[in-house]
From Swiss-Prot:
UniProt feature, compositional bias: Pro residues: 1-10
GO cellular component: nucleus
GO biological process assignments: regulation of transcription by RNA polymerase II
Identification of the protein by name: Zinc finger protein 581
Molecular function per GO: DNA-binding transcription factor activity; RNA polymerase II cis-regulatory region sequence-specific DNA binding; zinc ion binding
Organism: Homo sapiens (Human)
Length: 197
């Protein structure tokens, strides 16, 4: 992988190209449609071209990555039909099936919050998060779903359903390693990490 010039001399999150590459890449099952795909192309035998991708480093500075798709494949996998590359985040090593997913994920490592609420000034990394935030400025505080058993109100029906377990005592999330049950899936995940590593 080759890093091309960016607004700063080198992305601050990485000290070298080797540290950007992260763990070894793996090969997935199906071909990825996109700029380097030869599916449905009359030039299926032409050599692959390097592709440019825009990512964002941990300081929010965009930088371009040049990826030669063929050289990034695992040894022995280049001739295997129906296999494609998966992309690994250079910051956290999380693996993605498509480069577009990696690009979307890269904003999570940035401190830049370009979407600002015009009412209160709170800023967000994603437009969808700003849209959800706008509901708090609606009449009633943007919490139309009220609990019938207590005065609490919620933005959406899913939050109300999750809260209702407090009153019902329902614990739908069973630990696969022990008899404990949990009201929320994230609590089960925390339990599993701590008690059953």
């Amino acid at each position: 992988m080759l890093v091309l010039p960016s607004p700063c001399p080198q992305p601050l999150a990485f000290s070298s190209v080797e540290t950007m590459e992260g763990p070894p890449r793996r090969t997935c099952r199906s071909p990825e449609p996109g700029p380097s795909s030869s599916i449905g192309s009359p030039q299926a035998s032409s050599p692959p071209r390097p592709n440019h991708y825009l990512l964002i480093d941990t300081q929010g500075v965009p930088y371009t990555v040049l990826v030669d798709e063929e050289s990034q494949r695992e040894p022995g996998a280049s001739g295997a039909p129906g296999q494609k590359k998966c992309y690994s985040c250079p910051v956290c090593s999380r693996v993605f099936e498509y480069m577009s997913y990696l690009q979307r994920h890269s904003i999570t490592h940035s401190e830049v919050k370009p979407f600002e609420c015009d009412i209160c000034g709170k800023a967000f990394k994603r437009a969808s998060h700003l849209a959800r935030h706008h509901s708090i400025h609606l009449a009633g505080g943007g919490r139309p779903h009220g609990c019938p058993l207590c005065p609490r109100r919620f933005r959406d029906a899913g939050e109300l359903a999750q809260h209702s377990r407090v009153h019902s005592g329902e614990r739908p999330f069973q630990c696969p390693h022990c008899p404990r049950r949990f009201m929320e899936q994230n609590t089960l995940q925390k339990h599993t990490r701590w008690k059953h590593p």
